[in-house]
From Swiss-Prot:
An annotated GO BP: metabolic process
Protein function: Required for maturation of urease via the functional incorporation of the urease nickel metallocenter.
Assembly and binders: UreH, UreF and UreG form a complex that acts as a GTP-hydrolysis-dependent molecular chaperone, activating the urease apoprotein by helping to assemble the nickel containing metallocenter of UreC. The UreE protein probably delivers the nickel.
Name this protein carries in UniProt: Urease accessory protein UreF
Species the sequence originates in: Helicobacter pylori (strain ATCC 700392 / 26695) (Campylobacter pylori)
Amino acid sequence: MDKGKSVKSTEKSVGMPPKTPKTDNNAHVDNEFLILQVNDAVFPIGSYTHSFGLETYIQQKKVTNKESALEYLKANLSSQFLYTEMLSLKLTYESALQQDLKKILGVEEVIMLSTSPMELRLANQKLGNRFIKTLQAMNELDMGEFFNAYAQKTKDPTHATSYGVFAASLGIELKKALRHYLYAQTSNMVINCVKSVPLSQNDGQKILLSLQSPFNQLIEKTLELDESHLCTASVQNDIKAMQHESLYSRLYMS
């Protein structure tokens, strides 16, 4: 038997993933530091201006202390955040590995059509566009041909979908990309709670510490989900996001 054919046959039978479309022009870039940088609160995409409905919960006295803030976070993370943010990140990451631009754009279209609150649709689009433009402004970073093609074609990017394409394009492992994104976005939610409820800084840190086990469960759950679960969202959170549009006073854009 031809050894070359045997090796190729074995690769197909075990379902080996295709090579990550990583560019060789980034030999000077340390992905460990880069993933910290793009998930940092100072990465200029404007995340701090959005609460994604949380401000309504606070003004309606649904979130008033550490306990209710933790309850809100667990509910939000295990519903809307899991089935929209985390799952879309995974789907676009996997599609980027296959260089399937059509599927990525399809995922983004589903999210746009499934997001009822106007403020959330606008927030998703603004954060996604800002994430892409900020990466492109980093001239030392070569994102590769596929990411550049995606950046030109996408009409409704979100932070999660563009981040998924980014991570795949630079060869960042999926589980690591999910872990950093999940922690960073949850940390933003906790900061909003600390500022707006308000909570003490110590309470904020206690909340983050208590979420470590749920974090691991959410990541494992994300890896099990497929496209049929995309945007299985929380109706309650959509309602609060819509109510946010007519709040008398507000600190956040959503």
